[in-house]
Amino acid sequence: MATMLSKELQDIESILALNPRVKSHANVHSTASKKNEKKHWKRNPERSCDSCVNLENNFDDIKHTTLSERGALREALRCLKCADAPCQKSCPTNLDIKSFITSISNKNYYGAAKAILSDNPLGLTCGMVCPTSDLCVGGCNLYASEEGPINIGGLQQFATEVFSKMGIPQIRNPELPTADNMPKSFHTRIALIGCGPASISCASFLARLGYDNITIFEKQKYIGGLSTSEIPQFRLPYEVVQFEIDLMKDLGVKVVLEKGLGQNGLTLTSLKEEGYQVVYIGIGLPQANRDKIFEGLTTEQGFYTSKDFLPLVAKASKIGMCNCRSQLPKLHGNVIVLGAGDTAFDCATSALRCGARRVFVVFRKGFTNIRAVPEEMEAAKEEKCEFLPFLSPHEVIKKNGRVSGLRFCRTEQQDDGTWIVDEEQIVHLKADFIISAFGSMLNDPAVTKALDPIKLNRWGTPEVNSETMQTTEPWVFAGGDIAGFANTTVESVNDGKQASWHIHKYIQSLHGNTISATPRLPLFHCSIDTVDISVEMCGIKFPNPFGLASAPPTTSAAMIRRAFEQGWGFALTKTFGLDKDLVTNVSPRIVRGTTSGHIFGPGQGSFLNIELISEKTAAYWCKSVAELKADFPKNIIIASIMCSYNQADWTELAKMAQESQADALELNLSCPHGMGERGMGLACGQDPELVRNICRWVRKATSIPFFAKLTPNVTNIVDIATAAYEGGADGVTATNTVSGLMALKADATPWPGIGRGARTTYGGVSGNAIRPIALRAVSAIARALPGFPILATGGIDSAESGLQFLHAGASVLQVCSAVQNQDFTVIEDYCLGLKALLYLKSIEELHDWDGQSPPTIRHQKGKPVPHVSELIGKSLPSFGPYLQTKTQALAKYKKDASGDVIMDTGAARVNIPKKPIPNVKDVIARALKHIGAYQELDNTEQVQALVDPEMCINCGKCYMTCNDSGYQAIKFDPETHLPVITDSCTGCTLCLSVCPIIDCIKMVSRTTPYEPKRGLPVNPVC
């Protein structure tokens, strides 16, 4: 029997075994079998303690908040970027969270990092360790939605980590005079004691202000304070602290190690005698609170305070902290951790990594009174730490001179809220080690003496003004734990920030200078900020290439004024006509698109509008243009005008607009709705002859540049652009909106529907959905008319997309829908993003970056994937028994290798440009050499897909699209769900297009000849 061409071959049928099919009946399986089957596919841990993972020597990242680029982009897209954002109000350092998340969503990671570091010099540290659930996340408006709040800490960590990989140093504010030309007051000697978060923050802001004689004295051999010594490596790696210290040192701040308060004669008095006019105390609370029952116990006996234990763990696990590698504390058996704060849970999870078999966290009050943030407690719970509430330590049980247990008394809360210890209720716990984490204090007599002459409070710490951070001596300031206001790293950072302003104010007062009553601290700066993104077109110099299109964002002149104040380089007026052509709009008229699926809120991929031109008169716009040019002489204003096909009208309106002092004109020949019925807009712009004549009329009537705004709703936009060129236009705008019908409801009525009859018309689609059309138009015009100026519009919503249009041949960029999605402040993101994209082109070490995106490392859930396949000899998926095998192999390796990590490393910290930094003009039309006719494409250089099994999450999307939309070239293992590419792969790239993990699938050169499957022999011999 002859083979049927319309039936799959047997080998293809086997490939299709797991391909989805429409369900025709209900299936039946026993409960027992399903309980067993689920274990094979389980990704989350089993609830039983039998599944406990050995964590000894494993200091890999455990934070749930850590994000890959994919995760960061998805999370940033969810953010509403709210007005008067509550998250910002809940941040101690007042981070502009809305702005930095906006930058992340636009792939401008430097812009995000700049926003973060401008308000928080320890932005990466805080992104990793901030108790966000109690701060910014606690105020997120998305708490009122089903999907919950934004992972702000993870986004903050992601952006600053990417910037750290760029290796770009911090610089002084470029607007400051050189150090030699700064006033004498800025050479004041300033000392900071303690190199922890508060001092690093304070010194950074003082250096940004221009002070150049700043020294930090640190008693330890290492920097970073508690960030280094007490926060574990798996929460805060040492290289993060080093990165932030290096940024501070970039500004000239000096750090002196092994010289602390009360050490080697260092006192407040001695510093003053040495010529320091201001001292900032940021030494924390260096001694542990120690309950009386532990008096005399030592680490050799099995007793540690958190101040003993955590630094030992840090020195052994944080490579670079010390010159030599020390050993972890050797724990075993049962460990009791006393306390209910973040430090207690750090001790508990660290104990597991030091060999403890089981850890009990014991605290005096109940779960509802735990001081630790939920993130910390949850991490300990997931690692199978046990919690014992309502217990107060009463007596240490010893055996052979060592700790062998602890006797507790039950605590109870009375009706009046007070707590009592009931000694009749006794609990005995066996323990091999006890770690006390009952807080900290200052009780070193040498330090207390060195603090003289400032007054101390009843706790033995300085009296500090909560607003100025001054002590009782006006030249001495304090912050962080020792000041008594901060309980977290970010609050200590803010103490330093707050003090820096008042130190500045104090120093200037000594020199008779008055400064602003409102604090105004400098922003973070690096060389990226100095990149020139101005561009000249038609003899007009644009401060930057980003401007507002003639659209709803320029409804009024006052809106344009506000846009210029925010930094927009140019703006077009809303299109206006002669008074005889005045219009009145209908409503509703601007609606969200359906091109992004069911996404509600900002981030819409498109809008549809049936809005007409401006309802305001030509006189209004001409007077407004004159006002704006007078107040913003460096900004460019283009008057957008429209008439019917009438030479007298075009002549009159063009002359009127020119006399208003507009820098240029835009001829709107493309409005796709409403105006065409009046013989205007689209009615003029679809005929090359009409376009050519209108341009000739305007050229004859005016002397300033003008640009014809083209419609994409034509067969060949190049013909229209050529007509404009032949008519004397100085350039064109490409493109206006695409004519469309956005949505029909279930009852067949349209949206928008006007009036009782719910009538509509075809409107203009704008936004990202039309970007491919606009890019095609811009590149086609640029190829046909080399050097002809193009103002691009159509889906420009970021610096990255803007650069695409510049590469395609545009000179400047018009924006509308992106502002409708957000607000005028996006201009800061666009400018910084473009500066970064240009700057990074000059750094050879980053040649493998895609814009601001670093190469994707192998990861799962944003965390680097150790090369376990090298340990077990094969790649396995991350679920069920395979995950267990991988976890056990890694645990054994970690234990045997003393915690050395097998994973990719980051880039060097400092990268210096070795090539000239391109300007905007240098990148215009760079992509055109890659665009041409299909016949120019080489069909001998074939590629095929390659799946990275270590990054694959086993969803099978590649498999399904290849089966039902492609070439049945992917096998899908029924047990491991790992896809395998066969030689049948044609390199179509559908699999990569639907893969949810960035770079899990890559297209690589084909190693075997490609032979198309023709179905039947070509010209068979009969």
Curated annotation (Swiss-Prot):
InterPro entries membership: 4Fe4S_Fe-S-bd, 4Fe4S_Fe_S_CS, Aldolase_TIM, Dihydroorotate_DH_cat, DPD_II, FAD/NAD-bd_sf, FAD/NAD-binding_dom, Helical_ferredxn
Secretion signal, residue range per the UniProt entry: none
Residues reported in the UniProt entry to bind FMN: S550, K574, T575, K709, G767, T793, G794, G795, C816, S817
Residues involved in NADP(+) binding: 340-343, 364-365, 371, 437-439, 481-487
CDD domains, sorted: DHPD_FMN (cd02940)
Binding site for [4Fe-4S] cluster 2: C91, C130, C136, Q156
Membership in a protein family: Belongs to the dihydropyrimidine dehydrogenase family.
Protein known as: Dihydropyrimidine dehydrogenase [NADP(+)]
Encoding gene, per UniProt annotation: dpyd
